[in-house]
Amino acid sequence: MLLAIDVGNTNIVLGLYADEPAEGADPVLVRDWRMRTEPRMTADELALTVRGLLGSYADRITGISALSTVPSLLRELRVMLGRYWTDVPRVVVEPGVRTGVPLLVDNPKEVGADRVINTLAAHHLHATNCVVVDFGTSTNIDAISAKGEFLGGAFAPGIEISLDALASRAAQLRKVELVRPRSVIGKNTVECLQSGILYGFAGQVDGLVRRIVAELESTHGGPTTVIGTGGLAPLVVTESDTISHHVPDLTLLGLRLVYDRNFGS
């Protein structure tokens, strides 16, 4: 089985894929787990958590594909893989690793591994231009050509970051649960915050996506498929007018695909 590991700033996501999909079929995600990222976690602590979640699957791993957007955990991730899965073929996505994704930006080394992997997965799923909206610590909106080229994108503060900042800077406001309010017009402080965060972010995303799609199609033609992913995507996607597909495991799929590119399938 293949273990996919996505170490992000807020969460670490694990995915377990079946060994060999049927010819022409997409890889089958058997299980997935999500846990809070601890930036000071050591390789041994990371391994203890990962192996604990995997349970009996831990000794059935035949391949590993991983990435980390947290520099302090990238080294610990490498150490963990070398120490606990010594003989298992593995790929850690970083500059120099073969992904097959052309990075048509000013400085390709600045592009995060998660954005590259999402590009690979989006192009695998759709033979059109794509825009990927990844709702994580930041909200990343990336443009991809129908040829699978990464063209760049836009960053915006993530939902939780914005909510934390608002609660810390406004004396009478506090952090609230991120759920859909009864109506857009809030009847109390909690609902007003929930409405502003949820519908405000949906509007922000739709505005950026429309501009990106217009620019993308003016230079690369159309059509364009818009994909939502990331931990907070389920909350916003249903309120978005532009996101047509919700793919929760987009990054995990990309990790599976990049493993196959480097080790064959």
From Swiss-Prot:
GO terms for biological process: coenzyme A biosynthetic process. Transmembrane segments: none annotated. GO terms for molecular function: ATP binding; metal ion binding; pantothenate kinase activity. It catalyses: (R)-pantothenate + ATP = (R)-4'-phosphopantothenate + ADP + H(+). Substrate binds at residues 112-115, 189. InterPro entries: ATPase_NBD, Type_III_PanK. The active site is at 114 (proton acceptor). Belongs to the type III pantothenate kinase family. PANTHER family: TYPE III PANTOTHENATE KINASE. This is Type III pantothenate kinase. It comes from Saccharopolyspora erythraea (strain ATCC 11635 / DSM 40517 / JCM 4748 / NBRC 13426 / NCIMB 8594 / NRRL 2338). The gene is coaX.
